[in-house]
Amino acid sequence: MSAITPTRERILYAAAELFRRQGYAGTGLNQIVAEAQAPFGSLYHHFPGGKQQLAEDVIRAGGAFFQHLVTAIYDAEPNAEASIRAVFTTAAETLTATDFQDACPIATIALDVASTNDHLRRATAEVFEEWTTALTERLDDSDHALAILAALEGAFVICRAQRTTRPMHAAGEMAAALVTR
């Protein structure tokens, strides 16, 4: 990030990166402002609701960003099967390039807060619903869209735990086969 990037955006970006890698509970406010190179007071100036408001903004901004990214990858391919493979291949490449640290930021937060913070759980659920809707528009089958999203998110979790992209590739092949039926 550039030194001229506004403070709010630096804080949002730093929080998104840290939440994606460490989870919500594993990330402290001091760490966020240090990473953002921002004064501590600026966090509460821009996010008066504190860490929860910051996380909700990260969820919504991250959800929109990743939906745009995935749909761009998907739409660049000639057919649904190739599109699905490209999404899963890109996810595997990202995991490898980041030493399995970068996965889906929404899933990372959802897994962390689903049973302890209903406000953030609802925000993550809304993003997953938006993603399912976007994929349904491309596949014309909401069950297939949901199954593919579930396979992708589950593969992220298993890949990180096992430190291999094999689950992502296997899930991608299964998802691609689903759309060719």
Regions found by a protein language model. Give the residues of each.
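Short, charged helix-capping/linker segments at alpha-helix termini
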Residues: 25, 78, 139-142
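N-terminal intrinsically disordered/low-complexity leader segments
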Residues: 1-6
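Short, basic, alpha-helical segments at the C-terminal edge of helix-turn-helix-like DNA-binding modules
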Residues: 59-65
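Helix-turn-helix
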Residues: 10, 14-53, 57
